[in-house]
Amino acid sequence: VHQMSNELKSSITSIEQVDNNHFFMGTDKGLRYVKLENETLQIVPLEPLDKIQAQISSLYFHQESQRLFIGTFEKGVFAYDIRQQRIIHSNTDLSDVNIARIKPLNQTELLIATEGMGIHKINMNSCISEPYIVSSYKSHNEMNSNNINDIYIDEEKRIWIANYPEGITII
């Protein structure tokens, strides 16, 4: 166990690894790219990321496309393209909710769990998103809450949804 000082000077909310020594770290005040060297973290300036002023709630790094998908509290979801060094905004406004989790659905799509707008699906290449699983209050046999805490996809491709306050929905 090695305790490191927090060079980010902010509460760390999410971590994604890029390679053996580089990481993205989300905080309650923004996002940083860091390098682990000699058992210390060094901040690596990346201008597009350094400008993000948002509470980061969830991160997902897609190795093949070299894109970091960033979920925030009340600022929506967007992607950072490492190769082009630019931020790409999603077409769907998710700025009223917290992005609780970002998980891969398949080779080209991610699921975005929100606290208030159900689950959205986003294409990793185009960053176009759409509602995917939302509650239906008219039926008792469907998901009955749009407040999603977590999602998990098992080997059989079933989607497990931890929704508040009801518990688990499996689709």
PLM region spans:
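Carboxylate-rich, polar loop motifs that coordinate divalent cations or form catalytic acidic clusters
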Residues: 1-171
